[in-house]
UniProtKB/Swiss-Prot annotation:
Residues 71-80 have a biased composition (Basic and acidic residues). The modification Phosphoserine is found at S315, S453, S459. It comes from the Eukaryota. The gene is Cep68. One of its GO terms (biological process) is protein localization to organelle. This is Centrosomal protein of 68 kDa. Involved in maintenance of centrosome cohesion, probably as part of a linker structure which prevents centrosome splitting. Required for localization of CDK5RAP2 to the centrosome during interphase. Contributes to CROCC/rootletin filament formation. One of its GO terms (molecular function) is protein domain specific binding. It comes from Mus musculus (Mouse).
Length: 733
């Protein structure tokens, strides 16, 4: 660090004009290996370090001689030397030195306003760094937290440590001043006592400004004589402006050093213990080495190591400098944390209330479950970009994506930028069933080269949720999965298709049993035309690759154990139709053509619902009929009986349709059970036979295992109740 002009003159005056004191001279002030123009190094506040051959009795003389020799007037020209007699030894306290100095000054009657004030000003210049040099960064990293916090916060302040390069130049036997070294407050108090003793002619001595005696609290570096003198937090005299600025710097640096320098020892667990966890030790060591800034303490989550709130920051790197950095220009003005810079925002986790900073970050493009959620293009257009990027890139991208999205039907509504329907689309399925029929088959035209490439869609942007091609493919996959499969209808089944099998919308479609084609001949039927079953005939036959409708075999259920086949095409086309209407109380169709629409499961479900309703009504009607009294001979009794008859007759007529529906469905189900009884009987017989065959196979496998054991052991093991050929040789013997 370069010395200022006053400090250079002070060093020259020390080396040339200091009177010798015993064996001490100015040349011996400098440690070995240092040039005369280098600054002196202090071990304690205000105390210089010198070589071992320096006289211990001249310690205070050195300190005070620098004060007087730093002034423009040489001490040798005075009629009376400022200090007479032998100097005190090193064991004498600093307060006694100052008191003796005050008594000698009182004897000499030196005018304080003319002599001491310039000397103290130069002394403050030498020992205390100026305001302009307070922000130097060379010595800032080597300061102790006690230098920043001041003596008022640490009453027992020991000698300040020197930087490593300074300690190497200090002789091992060099004496040092006491830990209670000269502070600005002690200097001010002793000088004020001297003023009271000296009389009113020295009234100007008390007007020494506090910035010249107290250390600015923002001082970080030392020029010339050593570390700065730390004063109390309260100024001696008026100087509130400089002190207020110093307080702001003090709180700032105190927060910095509170994190940078830990107060405890590093963690050292017992590695020979059974409870020692190396991962836990590593985490504790990381927490100790890189502490977090003091802030609201959040509960530690044992399962997740990700912070849920961006409240705690690291020990701070960019916070030291007050200059404008590239990271500070990208800071969002609406961030919750004042330290949350733009470089830290993308690395923050996403959870619950954890998006406090990310919600305000204009580049937040996230992938939701229901569709692609994109932030508004107005925010994206106002995002600060590095110099050299084109402002029209976002507008070109918006126009390109909007144009291509309108051409593509399946994803045009979900990817329209800036549309207010984006938020509602996130909670709905990507393709509602009401819109599936209106979607055109030529939707895969989205894969044409009309889509802009990744290079065209802003390759300069860094935080995109998904690439364009991946989003495009996912949209096509969802479209192809929701696309219904169109089939050709059987002859005469165009009207039957509208009221096909239906189950609840939340459940899969019910399986359809084509019992007429499985067991019965194609010519048998109950009531309808030839070749048609009135209740169980398929109304939709899927087409094979040759364009011919494939019918199920008559022996599918009877001779094989194949699973019951369903119609996947009818699931997407007919859900919420027949069964919900039947359960709601509507009358079943009575013609043969309408009866052929229902499947077996639907018929069973409808029959059970209607039968339960009919049974409940019959119980109620029976109770009313039993409680009704016989008609009386009076006119009033006859009127009441007639009214009761009308109500009863009306109730019976209303439930006549329910009774007929139950009877009709019951007859159909009974006939179906009778027709399927041989099939069911055959299936049960085969199951029983298969069970016996499985048991015999298990016994045979067990016998083979025993035979293998016999061959390995060299002996014959005879199973129970199973005579073998090995018994005959034993019988002959």
């Amino acid at each position: 660090m370069a010395l200022s002009e006053d400090e250079a003159e002070a060093e020259v005056s020390v080396n040339t004009k200091v009177p010798s004191c015993g064996r001490w001279n100015s040349g011996k002030l400098l440690p070995s290996g240092l040039e005369p123009d280098q600054p002196l190094h202090l071990g304690v506040e205000g105390g210089p370090l010198w070589r071992a051959e320096a006289d211990p009795g001249c310690i205070s003389g050195v300190f005070l001689s620098r004060v007087h020799t730093a002034s423009k007037e040489p001490v040798a020209d005075r009629s009376k030397p400022p200090l007479r007699g032998p100097l005190p030894s090193a064991s004498v306290g600093t307060g006694e030195v100052l008191h003796s100095m005050g008594s000698q000054m009182e004897e000499d009657r030196l005018p304080a306003s003319q002599d001491l004030l310039p000397a103290l000003q130069v002394f403050g210049t030498i020992t205390v760094c100026s305001g302009q040099e307070a922000d130097s960064e060379d010595f800032q990293a080597t300061l102790d937290p006690s230098q920043v916090l001041g003596l008022s916060q640490q009453p027992h302040t020991s000698g300040l440590p020197l930087p490593p390069q300074w300690k190497s130049t200090v002789s091992p036997g060099a004496p040092q001043l006491s830990s209670r070294s000269i502070s600005a407050s002690s200097v001010g108090s002793s000088l004020q006592d001297h003023q009271e003793k000296a009389g009113p002619q020295r009234a100007s001595f008390a007007n020494v400004s506090s910035p010249e005696l107290t250390v600015p609290q923002a001082a970080h570096s030392v020029v010339g004589a050593g570390p700065p003198l730390q004063g109390s937090a309260q100024p001696l005299t008026s100087g509130s402006d400089a002190t207020g600025l110093g307080k702001r710097h003090l709180s700032f640096q105190a927060e910095y050093w509170a994190c940078a320098l830990p107060n405890s020892l590093p963690p050292s667990p017992n590695r020979h213990s059974a409870l020692w966890d190396p991962n836990k030790e590593y985490e504790d060591l990381l927490d100790y080495t890189y502490p977090l800034r003091p802030g609201p303490q959040l509960p530690k989550q044992p399962e997740s190591h990700v912070l849920t709130e961006p409240v705690l920051q690291d020990s701070g790197v960019d916070l030291d400098s007050l200059s404008v950095s590239p990271a500070s220009t990208l800071k969002s003005p609406t961030n919750v944390s004042h330290n949350c810079s733009s470089a830290e925002v993308p690395t923050l986790p996403f959870s619950g209330a954890r998006e406090s900073c990310l919600k305000r970050w204009p580049l937040g493009i996230f992938q939701k479950q229901g569709g692609t959620s994109l932030s508004s293009w107005n925010q994206l257009a106002s995002t600060p970009r590095a110099p050299g990027t084109e402002d029209a890139s976002w507008e070109n991208r918006e126009a390109a994506l909007r144009g291509t999205a309108e051409d593509c039907l399946p994803i045009g509504e979900d990817l329209r930028m800036g549309s207010p329907q984006l938020k509602t689309k996130e909670k709905e399925p990507p393709f509602p069933r009401q819109k599936r029929g209106r979607q055109h088959v030529s939707c895969p035209a989205c894969v044409t080269p009309g889509w802009p490439s990744e290079e065209e869609v802003g390759s300069d942007e860094e935080y995109l949720a998904l690439p364009t091609r991946l989003t495009q493919v996912s949209s096509l996959v969802s479209y192809s999965g929701a696309r219904p499969s169109f089939v050709n209808l059987h002859t005469g089944a165009a009207e039957e298709h509208s009221s096909l099998q239906v189950s609840d919308s939340d459940k899969p479609a019910s399986p359809t049993l084509d019992s007429s084609h499985r067991k019965h001949p194609s010519g048998t039927s109950f009531q309808g035309p030839v070749g048609q079953n009135p209740c169980f005939r398929h109304s939709i036959q899927p087409q094979d690759s040759r364009g011919k409708s494939s019918l199920m075999s008559n022996q599918t259920l009877g001779v094989s154990s194949k699973p019951l086949k369903t119609q996947p095409a009818s699931k997407a086309m007919t859900d919420r139709r027949l069964f919900s209407e039947l359960v709601a109380g509507e009358t079943l169709p009575r013609t043969t053509d309408e009866q052929e629409k229902a499947s077996l499961v639907q018929c069973v479900q409808t029959f059970c619902c209607r039968l339960e309703e009919l049974i409940c009504w019959l119980y109620n009607v029976t109770d009313v009929a039993d409680l009704s009294a016989p008609p009386r001979t009076s006119l009033t009794g006859l009127k009441s009986s007639l009214q009761l008859y009308r109500q009863f007759k009306k109730d019976v007529d209303e439930h006549q349709s329910l009774t007929e529906s139950v009877l009709e469905k019951g007859e159909i189900l009974l006939q179906c059970l009778l027709d399927n009884t041989p099939v069911l009987k055959d299936v049960l017989e085969r199951i029983a036979k298969q069970s016996g065959e499985l048991e015999s196979r298990a016994d045979h496998l067990y016998d083979s295992i025993l035979a293998s054991l016999d061959m390995l052991a060299g002996c014959t093991l005879i199973p129970d109740n199973r005579p073998t050929a090995a018994e005959h040789p034993h019988e002959g013997l």
